């Protein structure tokens, strides 16, 4: 496999040096240069044609968002990994970057010592850059960066499930649960607006993200969707036609009200599962307790296997299941895990997922 050629773009000298040095320590990575603003980066991208850029958002002359806008007009443009700050403005701008097609983002560490900051950044960079290299080197880069709205329609595949308890009949779904990670904001931006306003069921979403960022994601999606989208709050009753996004850094599950009639959202500080908080497995297990034969579970783009164990529980209780296909995933990790485990009823491209969700709810 050839080296991944990376351009480092940041207006801070310290970060340009630290990121460049850390990247050079990763096997298979070649740092081809640095740039201190988007305009210089754009010139270097046209000249040197890197595979990937690490990109700061706030820069003089041309910021990271403006650079991403320009990259849309460049054939075979590089992927982008954003370096973001844990602030409201930082999260809002990061959501914009992800919607514009950035591969993922890394938080600029806020540890107690410079050494701890460097170690945290090294760990994040290594994981994301290695994943990008495996996903893109040897494939056309446009495969991972083309907006889903421009992807050509592909076939939805119905699968025979090996593990479902056939004694539990699948009925109309009364709740939809979604697990998603890397590539999620862009995928949700394309998929959720296709859900009709009269869907008539609640939708619960676990998107692997840190605190603050999930609130920005919910705000951004709410402006684009026919249904309401909000960050979930502890103790609220789930309502039809609302999508609830699990808060970053917390776990989200379903519980029963005191009278046993309503289903409530419970936000907890329970430990991470699969190194994730929020965790898809954690949510899915709880839904299985209250919606036997009446749930639809969706696994979308993301690295790792979070959601596999939880989906196994749901499928044993008669849930419908939908998996995103490999071609439309930014990272085919979570969907591959559940597909390999024989837990998916239907595999479909991103632009057909909403249609399949509606089918399980309406069963027409």
UniProtKB/Swiss-Prot annotation:
Its EC number is 3.1.1.61, 3.5.1.44. GO terms for molecular function: phosphorelay response regulator activity; protein-glutamate methylesterase activity; protein-glutamine glutaminase activity. The keyword Phosphoprotein applies. It catalyses: [protein]-L-glutamate 5-O-methyl ester + H2O = L-glutamyl-[protein] + methanol + H(+); L-glutaminyl-[protein] + H2O = L-glutamyl-[protein] + NH4(+). Residues 174-364 form the CheB-type methylesterase domain. Its main location: cytoplasm. The active site is at residues 181, 208, 306. One of its GO terms (biological process) is chemotaxis. The modification 4-aspartylphosphate is found at residue 56. PROSITE patterns: CHEB, RESPONSE_REGULATORY. InterPro entries: CheB-like (IPR008248), CheB_C (IPR035909), CheY-like_superfamily (IPR011006), Sig_transdc_resp-reg_Me-estase (IPR000673), Sig_transdc_resp-reg_receiver (IPR001789). Transmembrane segments: none annotated. Keywords: Chemotaxis, Cytoplasm, Hydrolase, Phosphoprotein. SMART domains: REC. Gene3D superfamilies: 3.40.50.2300, Methylesterase CheB, C-terminal domain. GO terms for cellular component: cytoplasm. It is found in: Cytoplasm. Phosphorylated by CheA. Phosphorylation of the N-terminal regulatory domain activates the methylesterase activity. It is an enzyme of class 3 (hydrolase). Residues 5-123 form the Response regulatory domain. Contains a C-terminal catalytic domain, and an N-terminal region which modulates catalytic activity. Belongs to the CheB family. Involved in chemotaxis. Part of a chemotaxis signal transduction system that modulates chemotaxis in response to various stimuli. Catalyzes the demethylation of specific methylglutamate residues introduced into the chemoreceptors (methyl-accepting chemotaxis proteins or MCP) by CheR. Also mediates the irreversible deamidation of specific glutamine residues to glutamic acid. This is Protein-glutamate methylesterase/protein-glutamine glutaminase. It comes from Desulfotalea psychrophila (strain LSv54 / DSM 12343). The gene is cheB.
């Amino acid at each position: 496999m050839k080296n991944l050629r990376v351009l480092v773009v940041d207006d801070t000298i310290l970060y340009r040096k630290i990121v460049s040095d850390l990247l050079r320590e990763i096997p298979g990575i070649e740092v081809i240069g640095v740039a201190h603003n988007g305009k210089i980066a754009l010139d270097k991208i046209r000249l040197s044609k890197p595979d990937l850029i690490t990109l700061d958002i706030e820069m003089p002359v041309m910021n990271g968002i403006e650079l991403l806008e320009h990259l849309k007009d460049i054939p075979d443009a590089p992927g982008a990994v954003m370096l973001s700050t844990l602030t409201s403005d930082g999260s809002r701008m990061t959501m914009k970057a992800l919607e514009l097609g950035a591969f993922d983002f890394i938080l600029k560490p806020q540890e107690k010592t410079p050494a701890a900051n460097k170690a945290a950044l090294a760990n994040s960079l290594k994981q994301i850059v290695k994943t990008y290299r495996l996903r893109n080197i040897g494939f056309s880069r446009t495969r991972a960066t083309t907006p889903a709205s421009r992807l050509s329609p592909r076939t939805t595949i119905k699968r025979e499930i090996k593990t479902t308890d056939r004694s539990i009949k699948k009925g109309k779904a009364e709740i939809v649960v979604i697990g998603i990670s890397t590539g999620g904001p862009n995928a949700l931006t394309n998929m959720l607006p296709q859900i009709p306003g009269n869907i008539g069921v609640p939708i619960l979403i676990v998107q692997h993200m840190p605190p603050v960022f999930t609130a920005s994601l919910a705000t951004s999606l709410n402006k684009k969707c026919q249904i309401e989208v909000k960050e979930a709050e502890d103790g609220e009753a789930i309502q039809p036609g609302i999508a609830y996004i699990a808060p970053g850094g917390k776990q989200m599950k379903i519980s029963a009200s005191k009278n046993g009639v309503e289903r409530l959202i419970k936000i907890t500080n329970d430990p991470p599962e699969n190194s994730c908080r929020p965790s898809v497995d954690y949510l899915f297990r709880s839904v299985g307790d209250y919606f036997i034969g009446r749930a639809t579970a969706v696994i979308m783009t993301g690295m790792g296997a979070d959601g596999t164990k939880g989906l196994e529980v749901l499928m044993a209780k008669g849930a419908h299941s939908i998996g995103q296909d490999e071609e439309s995933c930014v990272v085919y990790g979570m969907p591959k895990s559940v597909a390999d485990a024989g837990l998916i009823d239907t595999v479909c491209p991103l632009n057909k997922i909403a249609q399949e969700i509606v089918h399980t709810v309406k069963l027409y």
